[in-house]
């Protein structure tokens, strides 16, 4: 089965988050915020994958809404990392743009699905 765009983007985003986590723990010796962003940044795609295996439209919607919330939380931790100088503005913008794009795609899917349920 071919992956859809949100599956692809969330998977690639998770890889970026894992690499950011490695950078933060190895180079910056930051272990608290980095764990938070690792958890929520990788759970976006995990929840999307779970939604695909959902038993009903409501379960599908619920998992997508969880993904959206995790994406918003990821943005929060990114902002904190930037404002506390753990990541540069350039590093922030690069990941932030992807997180925002994932949020927009998920929001559109959720709105469309709510209209059908």
Regions found by a protein language model. Give the residues of each.
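Short, C-terminally biased terminal segments at protein or domain edges
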Residues: 1-50, 54-117
């Amino acid at each position: 089965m071919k992956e859809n765009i949100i599956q692809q983007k969330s998977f690639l985003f998770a890889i970026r988050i894992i690499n950011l986590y490695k950078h933060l723990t190895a180079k910056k010796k930051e272990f608290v915020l980095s764990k938070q962003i690792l958890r929520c940044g990788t759970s976006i795609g995990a929840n999307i994958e779970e939604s695909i295996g959902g038993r009903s439209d409501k379960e599908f919607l619920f998992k997508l809404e969880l993904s959206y919330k995790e994406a918003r939380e990821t943005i929060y931790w990114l902002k904190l990392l930037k404002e506390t100088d753990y990541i540069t503005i350039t590093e922030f913008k690069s990941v932030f743009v992807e997180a925002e794009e994932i949020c927009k795609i998920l929001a559109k899917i959720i709105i469309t699905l709510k209209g059908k349920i």
